[in-house]
Curated annotation (Swiss-Prot):
Residues 470-507 are annotated as: Disordered. Residues 16-95 form the GIY-YIG domain. This is UvrABC system protein C. HAMAP family: UvrC. The UvrABC repair system catalyzes the recognition and processing of DNA lesions. UvrC both incises the 5' and 3' sides of the lesion. The N-terminal half is responsible for the 3' incision and the C-terminal half is responsible for the 5' incision. Residues 475-491 have a biased composition (Low complexity). One of its GO terms (molecular function) is DNA binding. It is found in: Cytoplasm. The lineage of its organism: Bacteria, Bacillati, Actinomycetota, Actinomycetes, Micromonosporales. One of its GO terms (biological process) is SOS response. It comes from Salinispora tropica (strain ATCC BAA-916 / DSM 44818 / JCM 13857 / NBRC 105044 / CNB-440). Signal peptide: none annotated. Interacts with UvrB in an incision complex.
Amino acid sequence: MADPSSYRPAPGTIPESPGVYRFRDGTGRVIYVGKARNLRNRLNSYFADPVNLHQRTRQMVFTAESVDWISVATEVEALQQEFTEIKQYDPRFNVRYRDDKSYPYLAVTVSEEFPRLQVMRGAKRKGVRYFGPYSHAWAIRETLDLLLRVFPARTCSSGVFKRAGQVGRPCLLGYIDKCAAPCVGSVSAEEHRAIVEGFCDFMAGRTDLMVRRLEREMADASAELEFERAARLRDDLAALRRAMEKQTVVFGDGTDADVVAFADDPLEAAVQVFHVRDGRIRGQRGWVVEKTEELTIGDLVHHFCTQVYGGEQGEADVPRELLVPELPADVEALADWLSDHRGSRVTLRVPQRGDKRALLETVARNATDALARHKLKRAGDLTTRSKALDEIAETLGLQTAPLRIECYDISQIQGTDVVASMVVFEDGLPRKSEYRRFIIRGATDDLSAMSEVLRRRFARYLDARAETGEAGVESAGDPATPAGPASTGPGVPDEPRVGTLVDPTTGRPRKFAYPPQLVVVDGGAPQVAAAAQALAELGVDDVALCGLAKRLEEVWLPDDDFPAILPRTSEGLYLLQRVRDEAHRFAITFHRQRRSRRMTESALDRVPGLGEVRRKALLRHFGSLKRLSAASVEEITEVPGVGQRTAEAILAALGDSTQPDEPRT
């Protein structure tokens, strides 16, 4: 670890303006991004007494080897810059409110002629009205199933809608009166839109008018002795009331707010948020995050707002009001920033009494319970993972536990569509952003394919090491131009030496930049021998290697005549099996994709610059590929949009496709 005093900037070079600062590790990778009202005061606080900092902050300061900053004019600009850089660099020491998924919304495609009701995730689209977010997609489908009795709107995809119109029969929902069947003309576009507007009014909280109208119609039907219709209206009312029960009314004034509460200890914090729309609780979400420094509840509110409401995904739905337990120090700048994202004024406040205070206390109890459950589960997970890694290290004779494990697998069918996968586990958990897929072109069997993929992976790693100037390392490929000296200037911090392990534009590691402590191959002694030979040819002797054979689950080591046997109940074996199975899943999925693509493509797909429209025009004109291949250049150019050069390329591609297949190199 670096001594913080070795890279501490001179206080006089740090401006006293607002800005954003970045700590980087030895490779130039951004590991922490922070915002400050006064850059000089904030940065000096890290170096004044680093030993007594918060545990995670101390680890960050001693891991870093450089710090740089950007000064801006206002706090709002600093807030925006901080958010942008956290999204760009994904620093490991920043508080991160995320759970690797986007939350579902109930979406209404109001811009279509026949609007559709559906579950939708991800980025919001124009012409779509959203209700939510919900915690689970099944909650949306359950609500829809109840409301389609009363509002029989379309829920099918465009393909299903068109096919039903072509055959003249609606889908099952049309027969059971849960769809008005606009696909077959049972209702007009105007009538269907009226149904959808009624649904939107109900979801927006205007429920009393709908209930009173149905009650009145039911009474009228009963008075006119239309008992079947009255019974249907009675069932519709019951469905509406069940749907209303799922969305508890907490505020009678139609409040549009997110209620946020926290529970924390010195190392972690749990956050819970209830989404209240039109006075009703629409959804609930929660996270548990690591605290990277001594953070107040106000600081946690700041981080929550910038990360949860700043994104382009569906979760970035900024409410009119945020009810929080404590206001952050930059509350005015934060409110301005949120208002810019929403497009109208957003307020943050601490409720003091009444229903809003009671709901905030309820959310706080949920946060406390969530933190307790997380700590109990995390204690078990950490113990299990540590035990598994220690068992693997002991079995393989490693000095330290393998914190980064890479596993490779080959997938093919009789030498066709040969592909390989590389999956990465760090600290016993999958790191999917590091997964890689390989197309194997020069090998047709598993052993040669395994050799090729390992040579390609570690050649890239050796090239990166050589370019950073590590002693004793020669490039495995073409020599790269060495990095030039960093530029400096008065009042500007020295730029960190960003080696080629890190992309200087993104601050993230390049592909294959970091070596594993352990390589696992899917297979037994032959696969391990092939992998060991490939590593030896490259001169890689500091990476452990093993293979996990199927069926007996034996662990094979290079040059060993007999496998190592881990107990069937061993945590180490469970981890190796999980790594191996993940590599197999990743490889076979890629293989199926390529095989499916190959089986459905034609020779015309390989013609450069020939798009789908012109391909269809050619097939319509000639009727088949056989007739097209027999045509002359002049005949092909008769097709609109096809010139002589393109016609020659088409004939060349069709001529190649009639030749026997040759192995690709």
